[in-house]
């Protein structure tokens, strides 16, 4: 049985959200191969990343009944300037809110923001196997682009990493990507 769908408020993430975000992500670090980190993170790491990236990349949280229930955010795909129009996307939903559509809702808001900003494409990196994540990404329009075999070792096993990409239609040459605050 799926958990009950509750209305979610999707908004920009703030520094005050990062302890809750850290708790959500640490669950996946400790219990799964969704995240290839092997040690839990501290809230300050999340705060530092948010402050460093939020002007250029959207960071969104979903609040349900006053609690942070998930996060979707983007960051740079690679550090070279030619990649400026490609972002990497990530989404995490608290275990209590899985299978409620919240991940797709968060991702839809994130993708609308990235497209409005002028990004050309978005890459998702998925630790495999992870059928629910693959299904969600493909339902949102991502297409598989490749795989690295046995790229990460976690929980006593080697795991593949898959790459999915969503392309937006943009002119050539592209215009500069807009800051998050200008969309």
From Swiss-Prot:
Reactions it catalyzes: phosphinothricin + acetyl-CoA = N-acetylphosphinothricin + CoA + H(+)
Domain of life: Bacteria
Residues binding acetyl-CoA, per UniProt: 91-93, 99-104, 130
Location of the N-acetyltransferase domain: 8-173
Identification of the protein by name: Phosphinothricin N-acetyltransferase
Family assignment from sequence similarity: Belongs to the acetyltransferase family. PAT/BAR subfamily.
GO molecular function, one term: phosphinothricin N-acetyltransferase activity
Keyword Transferase annotated: yes
Application notes: Introduced by genetic manipulation and expressed in glufosinate-tolerant maize by Dekalb Genetics.
Record CDD domains: NAT_SF (cd04301)
GO biological process, one term: response to antibiotic
PROSITE patterns, alphabetized: GNAT
Position of the signal peptide: none
Function in brief: Inactivates phosphinothricin (PPT) by transfer of an acetyl group from acetyl CoA. Can also acetylate demethylphosphinothricin but not PTT or glutamate. This enzyme is an effector of phosphinothricin tripeptide (PTT or bialaphos) resistance.
Keywords from the UniProt entry: Acyltransferase, Antibiotic resistance, Genetically modified food, Herbicide resistance, Transferase
């Amino acid at each position: 049985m799926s958990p009950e769908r509750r209305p979610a408020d999707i908004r920009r993430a703030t520094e005050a959200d990062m302890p809750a975000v850290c708790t959500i992500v640490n669950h996946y670090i400790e219990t799964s191969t969704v995240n290839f980190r092997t040690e839990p993170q501290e809230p300050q790491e999340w705060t530092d990343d948010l402050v460093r990236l939020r002007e250029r990349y959207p960071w969104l949280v979903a609040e349900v009944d006053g609690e942070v229930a998930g996060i979707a955010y983007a960051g740079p795909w690679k550090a070279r300037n030619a990649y400026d129009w490609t972002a990497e996307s990530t989404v995490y939903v608290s275990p209590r809110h899985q299978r409620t559509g919240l991940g797709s809702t968060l991702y839809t808001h994130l993708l609308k923001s990235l497209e409005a900003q002028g990004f050309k494409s978005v890459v998702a990196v998925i630790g495999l196997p992870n059928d629910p994540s693959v299904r969600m990404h493909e339902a949102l329009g991502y297409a598989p682009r490749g795989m690295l075999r046995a790229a990460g070792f976690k929980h006593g096993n080697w795991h593949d990493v898959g790459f999915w990409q969503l392309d937006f239609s943009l002119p050539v040459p592209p215009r500069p990507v807009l800051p998050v605050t200008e969309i």
